[in-house]
């Protein structure tokens, strides 16, 4: 992964728009589209064509657009202006303390946490749509009392429409990132201001509904976006432990690349950039 704060047209905007138009040209989609969600292998707000892409999607589809962002670039006026075209913006704020923020998110050195919080707060004041602040918690990393107190103060400053609490997936593939229980998240939710919801999934899938993973369908899925092993298991209804083992085998064989982002291991095609 490249750690940077430099905005560029990393992929030609025209190519992205052409792919969107190709998708919209299919009248009978497998699933009707309710909302277009813009995310990225890296960070959407680093792309200088973001505003144009959002506006194009809305004009062509008539559907609302949500943008997932790590929030690191929201101190910039140009980024805040481009995000105005969206309907929902979901920035991450996994910690409001510099020490635990660095540990869980491993941000680029150019990212300033105070600037980031101030930028998200300013955007909330200017934005007519919805802002949902997502917080990813990991046990003994960013869930301690001083972390929650700092987070509480930041939320009061930001004033988002929602706060969404999540935790790392179970079983975690990284030794240092352990999940919180539902009880842990409920306790923390009770300490935070505003409209707080727990979005972490603790449901267990029925074992007899699981399928064995097939490399072909997984590689096809990864052509669309990077995924974690639990993402793949959930989306394709695959047995989780077998899926994790297969992904490790595919990585060892060079058929997929591994990358770590926000404490989670993602897989992508080897030719992705």
Could you describe each region identified by the protein language model?
Residues 23-27, 57, 123, 250:
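Hydrophobic helix-cap positions at the C-terminus of alpha-helices
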Residues 15-41:
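Short Fe-S-cluster ligation motifs
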Residues 26, 30, 60, 126, ...:
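Alpha-helix C-cap/termination motif
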Residues 15, 19-22, 115, 119, ...:
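Well-ordered alpha-helical segments embedded in enzymatic catalytic cores
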Residues 1-14:
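Canonical Radical SAM [4Fe-4S] cluster-binding loop centered on the CxxxCxxC motif
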Residues 45-187:
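Conserved AdoMet/S-adenosylmethionine-binding subsite of the radical SAM
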Residues 143-273:
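Auxiliary Fe-S-binding modules of radical SAM enzymes
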């Amino acid at each position: 992964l490249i750690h940077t704060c430099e905005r560029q047209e990393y992929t030609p905007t025209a190519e992205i728009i052409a792919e969107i138009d190709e998708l919209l040209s299919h009248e009978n989609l497998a699933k009707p589209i309710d909302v277009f969600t813009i995310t990225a292998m890296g960070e959407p707000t680093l792309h200088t064509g973001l505003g144009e892409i959002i506006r194009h999607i809305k004009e062509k589809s008539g559907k609302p657009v949500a943008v997932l962002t790590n929030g690191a670039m929201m101190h910039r006026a140009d980024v805040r202006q481009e995000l105005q075209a969206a309907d929902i913006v979901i920035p991450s704020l996994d910690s409001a303390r510099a020490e635990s923020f660095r540990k869980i998110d491993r941000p680029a050195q150019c990212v300033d946490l105070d600037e980031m919080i101030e930028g998200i707060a300013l955007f909330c004041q200017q934005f007519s749509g919805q802002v949902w602040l997502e917080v990813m918690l990991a046990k003994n990393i960013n869930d301690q009392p001083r972390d929650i107190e700092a987070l509480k103060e930041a939320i009061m400053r930001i004033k988002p429409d929602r706060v969404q609490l999540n935790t790392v997936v179970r079983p975690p593939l990284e030794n240092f990132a352990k999940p919180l229980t539902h009880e842990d998240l409920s306790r923390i939710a009770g300490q935070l201001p505003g409209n707080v919801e727990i979005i972490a999934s603790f449901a267990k899938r029925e074992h007899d509904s699981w399928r064995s993973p097939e490399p072909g369908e997984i590689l096809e899925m990864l052509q669309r976006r990077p995924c974690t092993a639990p993402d793949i298991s959930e989306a394709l209804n695959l047995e989780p432990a077998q899926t994790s083992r297969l992904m490790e085998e595919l990585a060892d064989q060079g058929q997929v690349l591994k990358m770590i982002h926000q404490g989670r291991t993602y897989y992508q095609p080897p030719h992705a950039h």
